[in-house]
Design a protein with these regions (language model features):
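Gly/Ala-rich beta-loop-alpha elbow adjacent to hydrolase catalytic centers
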Residues: 95, 99, 103
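Short beta-strand/loop motif that positions the catalytic acidic residue
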Residues: 206, 212-214, 218
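Conserved HGGG/HGGXW glycine-rich cap/lid loop of the alpha/beta-hydrolase fold
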Residues: 8-68
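Active-site loop/oxyanion-hole signature of alpha/beta-hydrolase fold enzymes
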Residues: 41-44, 53-96, 257
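Conserved alpha/beta-hydrolase "acid-adjacent" motif
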Residues: 219-225
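Conserved alpha/beta-hydrolase catalytic His-Asp/Glu region
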Residues: 128-132, 147-204
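Catalytic histidine-centered segment of alpha/beta-hydrolase-like enzymes
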Residues: 243-256
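Flexible "cap/lid" loop of the alpha/beta hydrolase fold
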Residues: 104, 108-109, 114-144
Length: 269
């Protein structure tokens, strides 16, 4: 399995599909509790048009936690070093939730390395409810462990339609979260997120074409704050009815169509 080792000896897991100098590259950035496997449903369609890079950020999935306290700045530095290691000079970034936060911060700091920017389930600020949700996950994780936290998170990370359609396999979804995450690493992730700067503060220097995608049935982010982020990024905004926070998992074919059309500038890509 491919790993990149950072300057502080933290191993970052990644996987690539057709990354060559002649191919434009799309980078998928995971949300909290997610791994590179999260993007599996999008790989077949996207790999026909782009080289792909999926990676587990520090403390996610198969990547190490490392010894340095996690911060948004550290995630940005890790991605910059990974791209230099892979000789990727410029790429399209597609981020989901936490991954969108990292993608936005990276785009603000290294605009010359970002072609197009796609932000799923991110808003201009974290309101009191979203902070309370993250804090509740953190406390449940500390007091009762990963399985309890995963069950508690389900109604906030998935919309009602998805929960209804997949009610017979919710236990398997929870099992997957437990299998792919470590308690100590996830605690570090959630503690760090509560310290991140508001996404809206990182939009001043953006000059890339941007697309913001949100779900109407998402309790974590406020619709008005999502629209504010889209305005700050001068971005197109797609709001999906009946979809919750985990947009690529809940509506993969819609995301596939929206993003491929956006990246290609065509309705036929």
């Amino acid at each position: 399995m491919p790993y990149f080792t950072t300057k502080d000896a933290c191993k970052i897991f990644y996987t690539t599909y057709g990354v060559e100098t002649s191919n434009p590259v799309v980078i998928f950035l995971n949300g909290t509790t997610q791994t590179t496997l999260y993007w599996g449903g999008l790989v077949p369609a996207f790999s026909k048009h782009f080289g792909l890079l999926c990676y587990d950020a520090r403390a996610q999935g198969q990547s190490d936690l490392g010894d340095i306290p996690i911060s948004l700045k550290l995630h940005v530095a890790d991605l910059k070093d990974l791209l230099e290691y892979l000789a990727i000079d410029k790429a399209h970034l597609v981020g989901m939730s936490h991954g969108a936060w990292v993608a936005l911060a990276f785009s603000a700091e290294f605009p010359e390395m970002v072609d197009h920017l796609v932000l799923c389930s991110l808003s201009a600020k974290t309101n009191d409810r979203s902070r309370a949700i993250v804090r509740s996950w953190l406390e449940i994780l500390r007091l009762s462990g990963l399985e309890a936290m995963a069950w508690a998170a389900l109604p906030t990370v998935f919309g009602n339609s998805f929960l209804n359609q997949h009610r017979k396999i919710l236990d398997k979804i929870v099992d997957a979260v437990v299998l792919r995450n470590g308690r100590r690493s996830l605690i570090a992730q959630l503690e760090a997120v509560l310290r991140y700067p508001p996404p809206g503060n990182m939009t001043k220097n953006l000059n890339q074409p941007a697309l913001v995608i949100s779900g109407v049935d998402d309790p974590i982010i406020d619709p008005s704050d999502v629209r504010r982020l889209a305005d700050l990024c001068n971005a197109r905004h797609a709001e999906l009815a009946g979809i919750g926070h985990s947009i690529p998992a809940e509506a993969p074919r819609i995301v596939e169509k929206l993003v491929l059309e956006f990246l290609s500038g065509s309705s036929e890509y």
